């Protein structure tokens, strides 16, 4: 269903990987009294690894900007940030949901967009 929608809207799906017996990652957001709570179910996003990145590298290295967030495994994010840095590809890191990140590779991101929770 999602793939059909993307294709109908002329979005390139060449590098989308279907993971058998795994659901699509989802996030459920609730809002009460101006404060939000988010429940993330990683699903297939938890399966994104170096192999997925390597298979899509020819497209990634041509990008003007690569956006990553903490909804895929942290080692994969680190791998993406390092490879992009080496290839002079700008990286926007959205550190959501909040997690402990290694400052050594965090400095390699071009832009970081934390909210008030991730910043603390």
Predicted stretch roles:
Residues 1-65:
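Conserved N-terminal subdomain of the carbohydrate kinase-like
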Residues 65-120:
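Conserved beta-alpha-beta core of the PfkB/ribokinase-like small-molecule kinase fold
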């Amino acid at each position: 269903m999602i793939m059909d929608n993307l294709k109908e809207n002329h979005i390139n799906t060449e590098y989308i990987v279907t993971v058998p017996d795994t659901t699509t990652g989802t996030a459920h957001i609730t809002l009460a009294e101006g404060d939000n709570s988010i429940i993330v179910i990683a699903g297939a996003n938890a399966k994104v690894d170096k192999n997925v990145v390597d298979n899509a590298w020819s497209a990634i290295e041509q990008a003007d900007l690569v956006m990553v967030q903490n909804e895929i495994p942290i080692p994969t994010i680190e791998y993406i940030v390092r490879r992009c840095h080496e290839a002079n590809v700008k990286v926007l890191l959205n550190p959501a949901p909040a997690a402990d990140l290694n400052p050594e590779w965090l400095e390699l991101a071009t832009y970081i967009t934390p909210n008030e929770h991730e910043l603390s």
